[in-house]
């Protein structure tokens, strides 16, 4: 075939494709494909292996497969043996033929054929053309090099049509001729192309006949009038001007009829094949040609052509790839025409697949891998006999010996290497034909064994199933001693290959008669290979598969497309017909690539699909034990590892998903690795516990990541699920995932729980990563958050504003996920919270809060201010906490019950919280620097990561506001002041107030929940809570003064916050004076009680429960409690369901949805709102005002925050802390400075 520049060979000698076909030598090649002589290890026969790069834009093999299968059983058509594809190339295996006619003609001494040979060849070519037309296809590249003589004595006198890469279906499903395109583009080879082709007109059946006419003239004359002209336009003009009757002088007189007839045909007219055949018959009679006469090349000793080295088994495949094989070197691309014309419109179900690579047609079921007998005795290659170099074939095989062994580590070469459909090199000893027999036997036995294994696999029509199978295999491999998840990554390369390779559904020999998806028996070996190779041979049938193997479950188009999509590169691989303009009937192939693209997402897409459809990933995490989650993650990790880049490319199906995926996509991939690692370490324990420890030191990081990434995944899931499914499910799923991960992390490393204790590991790791990540991440996440959030918020906010609260939640979640890892972590913590119901509510609240948090994330300064405000409010909160604790104690019984539940949840959460603390600390580190620069004037509190404290303080600040409001409500002057201040700031910093209020509530809850944060406690379920509370206290301590000063300094008016700040300073400062190191904050029973109460409130299974209990607690505890309850009642609907709040959220989101969404999530807990009825009111409007920075803390998210605070205390710490609290923790001064800019920004 002509065309195309030299490129390195796709395959090398000795390579084993699909563990079945061993490459012996390259026969030909061109721009878009290569042809190899290969040895079928099953049948021991030589076959033609046609390969095209998976990356090349023009893919023709799928069309070739489609047409070749359609033509099976026709004379003059090669037997189809198999096909497939992997990440590197697509391939088709067919019967190997002898030399092509162009080669044979040139081999003649005169470069011409005799009339006898020409007439007999012409008649066979006409028959082959009629055959392809009979199935509704045009060849469109009729030329001597696309016809070859058979290799064996039985077929050496039969001419076979080759290369259907440029074929086009000219009939529709009804069998009617398709309407021609006005401009079709040039197809074919310039020398033999018809005038219509040169005119870019739609080619019809008569155009193939015109090409035949030119061939006949060339056979007889040795050349055409335009022989030396290469330019298509010039040749076209010559053809138009040339009197074709002049050509007849070289042909028998009867051919005038042939010329007249084809000249009279048009696109719609069916040629009279019988008439044309009669022309040949009459001419044969006229010239006295006998069918049995030897062809010119068979005449021994007449010319050296017989012994030309090129004859050595030169397959039917031309020494030169035809334009079709090359991708139509001579075709003129017409926009939209090239990619789709051929294959896309062929068969919707037609796809390159190894699934069909079964037993060759000639092979009986008995002669499968298990059987030693060859399907049929190999006939001697007549061409080899004529070729002095006939043995030359064996030479090339001997190359890759040790190299193969070393590179593949294959003891058995073919068997052991997970070729995943990728070529495997055969040991040199195997290379020689004589040695192939034992190898074949071994292969057969192995394949039989593998086939059995494979047969045990579920039918793989589903990509998901395929992925699951791969994951199982991966897991098995990893458990077998492959490496833990990280090794899985190395293994992952295989996995991606597997995805592709697996996606190489083997359609074997058999072409199903109309089968859109021909399925042919897959040899056990193949089936086996499919399983082992990663090729998902969907063959469900027994080892002895029928040629017609309809049992082969051919993956659906979409699934196949997913297969291609597994690597988006593959997705690009999807072969497009030459013309995009016209969908062609043979669209299957194109679809399959797209499907593969979908699979590219197998991880992400499937993950998303699973999330969307059933939250499978999360759901699995939730539904399945941690192990399942980790398995899923691990599997996905494996899949993702290879497909990570591809997965990243996966496009979100919805704006929310896009938002979630935007940053999350990247995160998603990391998450699988890290998250998987975590979950894996915890659940699978792939590696030794030490590895778990490693993971765990990483786990803080991982959790940091996983909070981000996992949570990002969760968030993505939330966003996606929220968009696609129920957020509640997400919440549950996330919780389960969190639980799974947390338990895994716990199992893997208590140090994670000890995060504070192991700060060296977690904090250091977290710090390192978070300094990198926080600074980078926070900044990046802020950048991402800000950019992504801004973009998303631009999208998400718009969506939030426009969309329903639920959507807001989704968008916010996505935003949150994208906004900050901390926020993500925060959300994740919330998600991870054991209490699913609460988690759902929280998730909802978080979703709402997320929108708030996201805005916050966008504006770190705003976050800082918010954090400061929150801290100030927290101080108030502590004062209020004192009050509330008094009033709440009454309710404590109920709260304790809730706390017990929530404590359990928080047991899980604290770890995340710890991670978040670490993350917050780490994140705080970089932001803190900024903050320190910004707020160096602010008093520095202990630099010890008071993140939890800060977070707690933030929570408390919000809680304090709620409590404060309660106190204010109790004390008329306070409520009045608060109201006045709130009213003033409703427009500016109402969100800040809300966030403060929610922060107070949250902190109160945190204080109650965290209690002491000791290593023991860290290990203990409540230890996490204690840690959170302790951290929150420390943070509060560090935050209070700076935050108060900053808050006071901050221009964001916070009436409640100001009052609360004073109160907080008064009451909280003593409480926070200790500022214990992050490792072990002092235990504060009172604070813990308050936190627990709020926690209980926040963690209530349902908003109604939460609100009712809060109401009871608050009412019983104090008027403030009542007001809190009241606020919660309205707020809770806002928070979880957020109907009222949703408007608020949009308001917040528009102004500060990024930040506010990040903080609001934590602060948005319904309790904080409950704490502040007026805040509820404000939260709808004030959120708008304050959502800019503090609002994010206060906003409607505040109510969420309070609930989330309990669950997400760490997470809240993460986001808030990261934004402001963390800065404070690093340097409380810094946060204030930051908070000021934040408040300015918010304003």
Curated annotation (Swiss-Prot):
Residues 674-695, 737-761, 1063-1086, 1115-1243 are annotated as: Disordered. One of its GO terms (biological process) is forebrain development. Coiled coil: none annotated. One of its GO terms (cellular component) is nucleus. Disruption phenotype: Defects in Ttbk2 are the cause of the bartleby (bby) phenotype characterized by defects in sonic hedgehog/SHH signaling and ciliogenesis. Embryos display morphological defects at midgestation similar to those seen in mutants that lack cilia, including holoprosencephaly, twisted body axis, abnormal limb development and randomized laterality of heart looping. Mutants die at midgestation (around 10.5 dpc). Residues 1073-1084 have a biased composition (Pro residues). It is found in: Cell projection, Cilium; Cytoplasm, Cytoskeleton, Cilium basal body; Cytoplasm, Cytoskeleton, Microtubule organizing center, Centrosome, Centriole; Cytoplasm, Cytosol. It comes from the Eukaryota. The active site is at residue 141. InterPro entries: CK1_Ser-Thr_kinase, Kinase-like_dom_sf, Prot_kinase_dom, Protein_kinase_ATP_BS, TTBK2_STKc. One of its GO terms (molecular function) is protein serine/threonine kinase activity. Pfam families: Pkinase. Residues 21-284 form the Protein kinase domain. Its EC number is 2.7.11.1. Interacts with CEP164. Interacts with MCRS1; the interaction is required for recruitment of TTBK2 to the mother centriole. Serine/threonine kinase that acts as a key regulator of ciliogenesis: controls the initiation of ciliogenesis by binding to the distal end of the basal body and promoting the removal of CCP110, which caps the mother centriole, leading to the recruitment of IFT proteins, which build the ciliary axoneme. Has some substrate preference for proteins that are already phosphorylated on a Tyr residue at the +2 position relative to the phosphorylation site. Able to phosphorylate tau on serines in vitro. Belongs to the protein kinase superfamily. CK1 Ser/Thr protein kinase family. This is Tau-tubulin kinase 2. It comes from Mus musculus (Mouse). The gene is Ttbk2.
């Amino acid at each position: 075939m002509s065309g195309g520049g030299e490129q390195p060979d796709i395959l090398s000698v000795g390579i084993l494709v699909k563990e079945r076909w061993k490459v012996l030598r390259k026969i030909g090649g061109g721009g878009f494909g290569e042809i190899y002589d290969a040895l079928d290890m099953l049948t021991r026969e030589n076959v033609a292996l046609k390969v095209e790069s998976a990356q090349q834009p023009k893919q023709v093999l799928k069309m070739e497969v489609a047409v070749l299968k359609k033509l099976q059983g026709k004379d003059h058509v090669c037997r189809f043996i198999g096909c497939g594809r992997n990440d590197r190339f697509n391939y088709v295996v067919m019967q190997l033929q002898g030399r092509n006619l162009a080669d044979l003609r040139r081999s003649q001494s005169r470069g011409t054929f005799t009339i006898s040979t020409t007439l007999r060849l012409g008649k066979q070519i006409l028959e082959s053309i009629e055959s392809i037309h009979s199935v509704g296809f045009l060849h469109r590249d009729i030329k001597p090099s696309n016809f070859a003589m058979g290799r064996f004595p039985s077929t050496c006198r039969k001419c076979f049509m080759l290369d259907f890469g440029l074929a086009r279906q000219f009939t529709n499903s009804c069998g009617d001729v398709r309407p021609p395109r006005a401009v079709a583009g040039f197809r074919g080879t310039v020398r033999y192309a018809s005038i219509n082709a040169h005119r870019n007109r739609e080619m019809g059946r008569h155009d193939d006949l015109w090409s035949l006419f030119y061939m006949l003239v060339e056979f007889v004359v040795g050349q055409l009038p335009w022989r030396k002209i290469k330019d298509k336009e010039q040749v076209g003009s010559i053809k138009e001007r040339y009197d074709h009757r002049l050509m007849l002088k070289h042909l028998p007189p009867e051919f005038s009829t042939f010329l007249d007839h084809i000249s009279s045909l048009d696109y719609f007219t069916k040629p009279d094949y019988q008439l044309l055949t009669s022309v040949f018959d009459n001419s044969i009679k006229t010239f006295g040609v006998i069918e049995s006469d030897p062809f010119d090349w068979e005449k021994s000793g007449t010319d050296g052509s017989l012994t030309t080295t090129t004859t050595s088994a030169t397959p039917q495949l031309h020494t030169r790839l035809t334009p079709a094989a090359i991708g139509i070197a001579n075709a003129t691309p017409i926009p939209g025409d090239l990619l789709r014309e051929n294959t896309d419109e062929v068969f919707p179900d037609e796809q390159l697949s190894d699934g069909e690579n079964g037993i060759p047609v000639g092979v009986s079921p008995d002669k499968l891998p298990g059987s030693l007998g060859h399907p049929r005795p190999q006939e001697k290659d007549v061409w080899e006999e004529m070729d002095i170099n006939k043995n030359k074939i064996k030479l090339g095989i001997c190359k890759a010996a040790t190299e193969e062994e070393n590179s593949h580590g294959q003891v058995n070469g073919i068997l052991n290497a997970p070729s995943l459909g990728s070529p495997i090199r055969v040991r040199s000893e195997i290379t020689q034909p004589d040695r192939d027999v034992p190898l074949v036997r071994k292969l057969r036995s192995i394949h039989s064994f593998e086939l059995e294994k494979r047969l045990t696999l579920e039918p793989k029509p589903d990509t998901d199933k395929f992925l699951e199978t791969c994951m199982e295999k991966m897991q098995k491999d990893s458990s077998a001693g492959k490496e833990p998840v990280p090794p899985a990554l190395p293994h992952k390369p295989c996995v991606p290959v597997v995805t592709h390779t697996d996606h190489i559904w083997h359609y074997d020999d058999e072409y199903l008669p109309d089968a859109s998806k021909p399925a042919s028996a897959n040899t056990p070996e193949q089936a086996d290979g499919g399983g082992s190779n990663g090729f998902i041979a969907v063959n469900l049938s027994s080892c002895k598969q029928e040629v017609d193997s309809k049992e082969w479950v051919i993956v659906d188009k979409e699934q196949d497309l997913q297969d291609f999509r597994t690597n988006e590169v593959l997705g690009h691989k999807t072969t497009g017909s030459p013309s995009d303009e016209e969908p062609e009937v043979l669209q299957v192939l194109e679809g399959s690539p797209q499907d593969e693209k979908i699979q590219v997402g197998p991880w992400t897409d499937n993950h998303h699909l699973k999330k969307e459809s059933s939250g499978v990933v999360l759901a699995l995490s939730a539904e399945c034990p941690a192990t399942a989650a980790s398995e899923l993650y691990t599997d996905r990790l494996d899949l993702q590892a290879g497909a990570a880049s591809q997965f990243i490319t996966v496009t979100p199906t919805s704006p929310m998903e896009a938002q979630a995926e935007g940053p999350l996509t990247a995160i998603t991939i990391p998450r699988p690795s890290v998250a998987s690692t975590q979950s894996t370490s915890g659940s699978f324990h792939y590696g030794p516990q030490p590895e778990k420890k490693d993971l765990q030191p990483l786990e803080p990081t991982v959790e940091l990541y996983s909070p981000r990434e996992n949570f990002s995944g969760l968030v993505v899931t939330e966003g996606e699920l929220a968009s696609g499914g129920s957020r509640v499910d997400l919440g549950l799923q996330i919780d389960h995932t969190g639980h799974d991960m947390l338990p895994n992390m716990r199992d893997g490393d208590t140090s994670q729980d000890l995060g504070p204790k192991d700060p060296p590991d977690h904090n250091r790791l977290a710090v390192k990563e978070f300094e990198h990540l926080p600074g980078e991440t926070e900044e990046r996440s802020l950048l991402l958050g800000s950019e992504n959030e801004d973009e998303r918020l631009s999208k998400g906010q718009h969506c939030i504003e426009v969309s329903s609260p639920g959507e807001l939640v989704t968008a916010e979640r996505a935003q949150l996920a994208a906004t900050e890892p901390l926020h993500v972590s925060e959300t994740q913590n919330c998600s991870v919270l054991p209490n699913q119901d609460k988690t759902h509510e929280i998730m909802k609240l978080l979703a709402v809060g997320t929108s708030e948090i996201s805005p916050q994330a966008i504006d770190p300064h705003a976050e800082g201010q918010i954090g400061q405000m929150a801290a100030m409010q927290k101080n108030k909160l502590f004062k209020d906490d004192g009050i509330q604790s008094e009033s709440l104690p009454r309710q404590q019984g109920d709260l304790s019950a809730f706390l017990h539940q929530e404590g359990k949840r928080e047991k899980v959460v604290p770890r995340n919280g710890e991670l978040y603390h670490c993350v917050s600390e780490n994140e705080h580190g970089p932001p803190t620097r900024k903050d320190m620069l910004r707020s160096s004037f602010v008093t520095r509190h202990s630099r010890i990561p008071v993140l939890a404290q800060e977070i707690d303080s933030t929570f408390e600040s919000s809680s304090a506001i709620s409590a404060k409001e309660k106190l204010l409500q109790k004390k008329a002057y306070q409520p009045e002041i608060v109201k006045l201040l709130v009213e003033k700031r409703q427009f500016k910093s109402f969100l800040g107030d809300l966030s403060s209020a929610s922060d107070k509530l949250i902190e109160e809850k945190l204080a109650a929940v965290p209690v002491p944060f000791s290593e023991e406690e860290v290990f203990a379920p409540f230890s996490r809570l204690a840690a959170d509370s302790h951290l929150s206290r420390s943070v509060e301590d560090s935050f209070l003064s700076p935050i108060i000063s900053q808050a006071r300094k901050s221009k964001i008016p916070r009436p409640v916050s100001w009052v609360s700040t004073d109160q907080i300073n008064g009451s909280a400062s003593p409480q926070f004076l200790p500022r214990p190191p992050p490792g072990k904050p002092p235990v504060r029973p009172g604070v813990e009680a308050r936190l627990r109460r709020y926690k209980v409130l926040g963690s209530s299974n349902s908003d109604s429960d939460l609100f009712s209990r809060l109401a009871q607690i608050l009412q019983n505890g104090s008027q403030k409690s009542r007001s809190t309850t009241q606020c919660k009642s309205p707020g809770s609907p806002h928070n979880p369901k957020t109907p009222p709040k949703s408007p608020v959220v949009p308001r917040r989101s528009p102004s500060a949805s990024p930040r506010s969404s990040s903080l609001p999530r934590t602060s948005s807990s319904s309790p904080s709102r409950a704490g502040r009825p007026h805040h509820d009111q404000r939260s709808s409007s004030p959120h708008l005002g304050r959502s800019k920075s503090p609002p994010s803390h206060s906003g409607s998210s505040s109510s969420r925050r309070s609930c989330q605070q309990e669950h997400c205390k760490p997470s809240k710490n993460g986001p808030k802390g990261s934004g402001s609290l963390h800065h404070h923790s690093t340097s409380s001064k810094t946060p204030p400075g930051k908070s000021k800019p934040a408040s300015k920004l918010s304003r």
